[in-house]
Amino acid sequence: MKYASYLLFISFLLLKLPAAVCQQTYYLKNSGEYVKKKEQADFIRVVQKRVKNQVLYPISDFYLSGNKKSVGWSYMKVPPVYEGQYVSFFETGATKQVMKYAGGKIVDTVQSYFPNGKLYKSLLYTQVGDSTNIYVITVNDSTGKSLVANGNGQAIFYDDAFKYISEQGRISNGEYEGEWNGVFKTSGSLRFKEFYVGGKMLKGESVDEQGNVFHYTNPEVPPSYEGGINNFYRHVASGIRYPPAAAAQRIQGKVHVKFLVLADGKIGGVHVINDVHPALADEAMRILKSSKNWIPGRQKGRIVEMTYIIPISFSLGY
């Protein structure tokens, strides 16, 4: 299967919530949005000071209960650009996933586990340009029984919380093959059927709770700007105003703005996800909010609201 990157431009650390100095604490929603108060957050992120001669920041995420959620290393504090081993945990403390990053992208083998500690699946990630090829190597059931071995077998996949079967079908040489059936529960429930040859989807059909039928050949189509992304940047260039406070201090930089493209093409939930001067952040959000011509994304053929990230650069030209 191939998953294109939608971002344009684009060892364990601490086992208990630390109380040490030389660290920064952030509050985040599951969407990745940074919020000001713990009461607004879904989890807590602690970024430790870099060790001498170390280029990476140790980053630990915690559930609101204080139990560890994930640990990893990053080149940047906000947003993280992970490098090397990254481990996530269930709130019980059991290991959920073990993976490796290179330059912020998942590479090599990802091992996922059931809440009971049994190996769930192993996936192999390979980078081809801006796309990622993902091969299914191993799939087991919760008792440890093998369903897929060496890239061949009948796979059963679950939702992230292991509450229901999300999809099932045949794996051949690490890729989806033949008919796949499943349930998609983002923005309402959809039942779907898809047909694959050599990992490439030929066609898909989904049905929502009201009986509406959707046909598609791409399971996920990201949002886009009317006329293309260059048209969006022309809109930015014609309307952006360099903040005087930032210009006076000769502050430049790139602002990464995350937002939702709603089902009607409007945008919402606009927020900045990297550490920049507040004046640059405010202006980037203002110009983005003034853009009106967004085309919503689709999942399983149905129009849905979808998250998007876009960079806006500020340069004084000297």
Model-derived segments and their meaning:
Residues 20-248, 252-286, 290-303, 310-318:
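Glycine/tyrosine- and acidic-biased, solvent-exposed loop/turn segments at the edges of beta-strands
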